[in-house]
């Protein structure tokens, strides 16, 4: 919300989302009145358990959003990137605002933004809502991505066996789901997400085919489908973080050790 206020200033409208008592805030970008931003309720995943989470998820899957500005807490990167992977899979172009970067610096930690962007496959901009840095840049990046197509996007890649199952489910789905979000729906069906299963008008044949794909994959992994996806997401996130994170304290200690060795010699 702090970032939203900085981007929109006083150009805001406040109301409720239809059918629920969840506050709805939208606004025009101060420096580009052609851009409208919806301040969605904060969520940690695309599996909703509260009215606020369902509002955010439903809006993102409504095909109305041209771009997602994903605010990531730089001090809690791994937990926040779990949602980021799911947002990328919606097929909507994502730009990540790596917020609270100033707090991270104070902890003696660094994130290589370029490496994070490369391995995530989305634009990433370091921001600080408190110090009001990086705000204009991240809005420009997000605006630029609105022209991207699904073919331009890079999705998180998981274990080959899970990828094979996702591909098979995509074949079964065909045109039964919006093509932009097809991968998202395929993964959610693999996880046996009850909300998605209820929303989609699939034939009995399609449902049986998907059940068989899930059963065989669970036997191969010797895990249940939901656990397979959770573990694969975190494995992907861990690889990304290892590539992008560094600790200045660790570096200083290593440098000190090197100097000690030189002096000793």
Regions found by a protein language model. Name each.
Residues 1-49, 62-63, 67:
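Conserved G1/Walker A P-loop phosphate-binding module
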Residues 3-4, 22, 37-39, 56, ...:
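Residue-level signature of catalytic and energy-coupling elements of molecular machines
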Residues 8, 45, 60-61, 88, ...:
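Signal for well-folded cores of large energy- and translation-related assemblies
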Residues 19, 42-43, 74-78, 100-105, ...:
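Conserved nucleotide-binding/hydrolysis micro-motifs of P-loop NTPases
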Residues 30-32, 55-124:
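Conserved C-terminal guanine-recognition region of P-loop GTPase G domains, centered on the G4
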Residues 95, 105-249:
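Alpha-helical transmembrane helix bundles of large polytopic membrane transport and channel proteins
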Residues 256, 260-264:
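Alpha-helical membrane-interface segments at transmembrane helix boundaries
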